[in-house]
Amino acid sequence: MQTKRENQPTFFDLAVQQRGSVNRVLETIAREVDFSEAETRVTATYRQGGRPACRAGVLLRVMILQHLYGLSDPQAEEQLQDRLSFQKFVQLDTHEAVPDETTICRFRQRLIACGLHEALLGLLNTQLEARGFIVKRVTLVDATLVESSRKRPDAQAAREGRAPDADASYTRKYNQSFYGYKAHVSSDGEHQLIRAAAISTASQYDGEVLAHIAPADSEVIYADKACDTKANQAWLRAHGIRNGILKKEAHHIRLTAADVAQNQKKSLVRRQIERIFAHLKKWQHYRRVRYLGLAKNQLELTLKAVAYNLKRLAGILEMRRA
């Protein structure tokens, strides 16, 4: 694939660098994180030759911007036209055209088709682990509900598969009906960095997902009562992981006073992960998914996890410098 990038910056490039608007978060991310391996993997999926295309590295960074600031494809195109800090972050040269919304959309489809979105969070976390930001001692696991991007169908249509979003489903929480998806996350207990993230239909039982998102290299895993199943207890024992899951009562087993006290202690640790969901929903606009289907919404969640970790890294480094 041919690209538009020139090796030598123009005079105007240098002028823009000197007067460009300051965005400390983006500058810290650009300085501290190496995107080269991710860029190489994406670029390798393109055919060699043909007409010039927007560079994969530019589009990858556009994806990150979108999920840092909750931007749609048209909004991303518009903001890139106007904000020098965004142009600088995506490494867009002054002679390069800003990618339009169609190009951004096609790049997203390419990531899904090639399965590369599954590697993006792992590539970032490898760097964070190497620098000691992800500590594998304590892992927190939890899930949150995210609304569907489509209007709720009636229950009969949903059961018969006639809903506009076939992968969304109904569930109940706090005695209220909810239609959409469920985002499952595991995080590092020390710095609250996301280690793994998976999307499921809203009716998916939390306990069935723990083994898929909880890293097996953890020393102890804290999770809600929904994960207190025999299968999860066996999985923890098989991997030599201490059980920090809150105990739940069964119809034939009552919790002792000691169990209740232990649950309270575990809950104090586990609830730290709720800050991640609060950030995703408030600052990264994740109260509602943007797309239809599990595949596209898994990509969205993965990119939001990448963006969250990048912003969290910038915050940690800023606190250390203070």
Predicted region positions:
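Charge-patterned, long linear interaction tracts outside catalytic cores
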Residues: 295, 303-322
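Basic, short loop/linker segments at the boundary and entry of helix-turn-helix/winged-helix-like folds
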Residues: 20-64, 68
